[in-house]
Amino acid sequence: MDWFCNKSEGGASKDIKSGLWELTTMIKLPVLVMALLALAGCGTREDSLVITGSSTIAPLMTELAERYEETTGVQVDVQSGGSGRGISDTRQGLADFGMVSRALKAEEGDLTAHLIGRDGIAMIVNALNPVTRLNDAQIVAIYTGEQQSWSAFGGNDAAINVVHKADGRSTQELFLEHFGLSNDRVKPDMVIGENQQGIKAVAGDVNAIGYVSIGTAIYEADAGAPLRLLPLSGVPATLEQVDQGHYPLSRELNLVSQGELSDAASEFLAFITDPGQAGIYHDYYFLPVSR
């Protein structure tokens, strides 16, 4: 014991104290690092949101996100890719919200739909095409290749160029469902993803026919794109008809989520469904939930 006390006056005590300090530091540092990382992760989640999915909703959501960021400082990253991507990303935790331009299916009951607006799907042709209306049977004949010339419908003696939506797009799903078609029966000349691709294809080809969001089609036509929206089942393709429940290919515009919403997600949802934002929906020719 005397030896220990004597040695501590020299170097032994310092060695022991130094070792104890190093051991304590070794234990504390990982805990501190983990705590800092956890805090950093929490800060990132509350200061940013990711929203992916429907190309129909994406332009509207981008503008709403910009307004929200200006107001709150919370960054909102909006990415399109189709409603299918919105569903998948939300389930995998890659997105806080998925944009889905249809009602959820029974097998998607693990997700929660937050209705933000309404829209419809319109058949479109070039404004220079003399054909002004087609019934459902004629549209089916065109899309299955049974009729391949506009002359069969009082139009020009020219081949019909069929523009069809890609898999994973809710616009395609609803189109097929309405006309009682399976995708393998459709004989397209062009397959597109984004609505803007469909607008560009039909606006640039007098012999093309396609289908896109009513809101997007009206927006682009008003901006000068040479488009004509055809009546569907005899009902004009207008927002008024959608609003009154008369248009046969109307649809929900949803943000979907999984599990409990974070505070940031809840606050964003409240912001975009506030009646004060209704004007932005009207700018994009959509019907907002709150008016």
Q: Can you annotate each of these PLM segments?
A:
Residues D15-I16:
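Intrinsically disordered, low-complexity segments enriched in serine/threonine/proline/glycine
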Residues C42-G84, S88-L94, V100-R291:
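Exported/periplasmic ABC-transporter solute-binding proteins
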Residues S8-G11, R45:
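General secretory precursor processing signal
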Residues L32-L36:
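Hydrophobic helical h-region of N-terminal Sec-dependent signal peptides
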Residues E9, G19-V31:
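Bacterial N-terminal signal peptides that target proteins for export
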